[in-house]
Amino acid sequence: RYTLLTSAIKTCNDNKVYLAQFFRVISQENSADIYQAAKDSDYYIGAVHEDEPANGEELVNILLNKGDRNIGLIGWEQGDATWLGRWEGYKAGVDKWNEEHPDDQAKLSEPQYAGTTSEGGSKAAEALMAADPNLDALIPAGGGGDPLQGAIAAVERAGKTADIDVVSTDFLPDLGDRLENGSMAGESGGHFCDPL
């Protein structure tokens, strides 16, 4: 099978140039031929990528360990692979918690989608707060931080900064201040190196 990545690997092999992939890892199971081409190359050195399910589970665990049980989800775009991976992790974290704590159950909202704007994040947070008066946590995901900023602003306008913990993967420039003043309760993220 000929793909953009197999073409890039071939070009690097032909020209003796090293190649690293960013953001996605080659699946040995789903893309066996591409994986093998990369493995056979002297010049393909690996990928740097996020483990979205692990990251999502970590965010949920931060909230559960803080005592939050009614978690609102704000996604980026419906069907986005990054969002779907994180959502898988959120669900896995809550499922594990509920199995281990049958008398202290947690729940996730259905996601509200914010797009990539602060206004979208604000509207999504407002909708979640209106739908669930017991909401005690929000996880805005994706969009490069703008939806997160909008969600934080909505929580602040509602006077609920002390009542609703906000965690995210998007690192804001003022993250330290936000963690200190309580407008954010935690952060999880990072990348992994995956050499073949």
Question: Residue ranges of each PLM-predicted region?
Answer:
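Hydrophobic alpha-helical
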Residues: R1-N15, G89-Y90, K107-R178
